[in-house]
Amino acid sequence: MRSHTITMTTTSVSSWPYSSHRMRFITNHSDQPPQNFSATPNVTTCPMDEKLLSTVLTTSYSVIFIVGLVGNIIALYVFLGIHRKRNSIQIYLLNVAIADLLLIFCLPFRIMYHINQNKWTLGVILCKVVGTLFYMNMYISIILLGFISLDRYIKINRSIQQRKAITTKQSIYVCCIVWMLALGGFLTMIILTLKKGGHNSTMCFHYRDKHNAKGEAIFNFILVVMFWLIFLLIILSYIKIGKNLLRISKRRSKFPNSGKYATTARNSFIVLIIFTICFVPYHAFRFIYISSQLNVSSCYWKEIVHKTNEIMLVLSSFNSCLDPVMYFLMSSNIRKIMCQLLFRRFQGEPSRSESTSEFKPGYSLHDTSVAVKIQSSSKST
C-alpha cells in the first residue's frame, strides 16, 4: 500500500494545483467570504489521495441511480394508477416516491463530479442547488416515513369508530406543509449563497470547515436531532404494531388466516431494519462530522472524517432503491396492481382479475385496513 504524507500548506485560491486523483480540503480563515474570482484569501489545504474513494462512489451512485430510477418510476406509475380514492398511507407513499426520484436526479451530477477527478465546473450556484436538493429530498423521505409509522400506530390502536382520525385530506395537508417547509429552506440556502458571491473553487461535494459558518453547522445539528426523534417514533410505533399483531395472531391461531398477522408483524420490523441500515450510520456519524467542522482538526483526522461521511452517505442514498423494493416484495396488493397495469399497458385490455379501481388494501407493508381486522378480532375475542 502506498503511503501518503498529509501536509498543511497556505496558498492562494487561484493557484491550487490539482493532480489526477488528489483533492484539497478547503479551510477558509478569512472573516469575510471572497467577493469575486480574483480574491486570494489565505486558506489551509489538506491534500489527499481519493482515487479509490472516487471509484467506489462512482460505482455505488451509478448502481443506485439505475436501480432507483427504474424502481421509483414503476412505483409512481402504480400509485398514480390507483383510480379509487387514496387513503392516507398511499398519499404518503406517493410523496416518498416523488422525493426519492428527485434525490435520484441529483446523482448524475455527483457521478460526473467523481469521474472528472473531483472537479466541479458548473459553478458555485449549481453546486449548492444540487447539494441542497439532495439533502432536502432525503429528509423529506425520512419525515414522511415517520408520519407513515405514526399513521399506522394511531389507526391500529384506536377503535373502529375513530380509525378515520387521520383522513386523506389531512395527509395531503401534512405533505403540503412538509414540501413548503423544505422548499423554504432550499430557497433560503440558495439566496444566502447568492449573497456571499462566487469563489474560485472547483470542489463541490467535499468537507468544508464551518469556523465562520456556525449558523449552518447548527442547522445541520438540528436536522440530526430531528432524525433521531423520528427514528425513536418509528421504533416505538412499529414495536407497538408488531406486539398487537402477534397478540392477535396467537388469539386467532385456530383460524386459517392467523398467519397473516404474524407475517405483517415481521414486515413491520423489516421496515425498521432497512431504515436503521440506511440512515442510522450516517446520522450517528454526523455528530463527529459537525464537531470536526467547528473545531481545529489535523489533516489526517479530516481525511478520515471526510471518507467515512461519504461512505455513510452512500448508505443513505441506497434507501431510495429499497423503498420501491419494499413496496413490491412485501405487499401482495401493490404487486397485483403493478401486474394489472402492466398487463393493460402492453395487452391493451383489462385483466380478468381485480381492477385497480376496486383496489382494497389488505395485509401489506404499509396498508392500514389491517387495523380494522385487528380491532374486530379483538372485540370478537
UniProtKB/Swiss-Prot annotation:
Coiled coil: none
This protein's record includes keyword Cell membrane: yes
UniProt GO MF annotations: G protein-coupled purinergic nucleotide receptor activity; G protein-coupled receptor activity
Disulfide bridge map: 127-204
Gene Ontology biological-process entries: G protein-coupled receptor signaling pathway
Subcellular location: Cell membrane
Membrane topology: Multi-pass membrane protein
Ranges of the Cytoplasmic topological domain: 83-88, 150-171, 238-269, 332-381
Residues listed as glycosylation sites in the UniProt record: 28, 36, 42, 200, 295
Extracellular topological domain residue ranges: 1-61, 110-128, 193-216, 291-310
Signal peptide as annotated in the record: none
SUPFAM superfamilies membership: Family A G protein-coupled receptor-like
Transmembrane segments: 62-82, 89-109, 129-149, 172-192, 217-237, 270-290, 311-331
Domain of life: Eukaryota
Keyword terms, alphabetized: Cell membrane, Disulfide bond, G-protein coupled receptor, Glycoprotein, Membrane, Receptor, Transducer, Transmembrane, Transmembrane helix
Any single GO CC term annotated in Swiss-Prot or TrEMBL for this entry: plasma membrane
Tissue-specificity statement: Broadly expressed. Highly expressed on mast cells.
Family recorded in the similarity comment: Belongs to the G-protein coupled receptor 1 family.
Function: G-protein-coupled receptor of lysophosphatidylserine (LysoPS) that plays different roles in immune response. Acts a damage-sensing receptor that triggers tissue repair upon recognition of dying neutrophils. Mechanistically, apoptotic neutrophils release lysophosphatydilserine that are recognized by type 3 innate lymphoid cells (ILC3s) via GPR34, which activates downstream PI3K-AKT and RAS-ERK signaling pathways leading to STAT3 activation and IL-22 production. Plays an important role in microglial function, controlling morphology and phagocytosis.
Protein name listed in UniProt: Probable G-protein coupled receptor 34
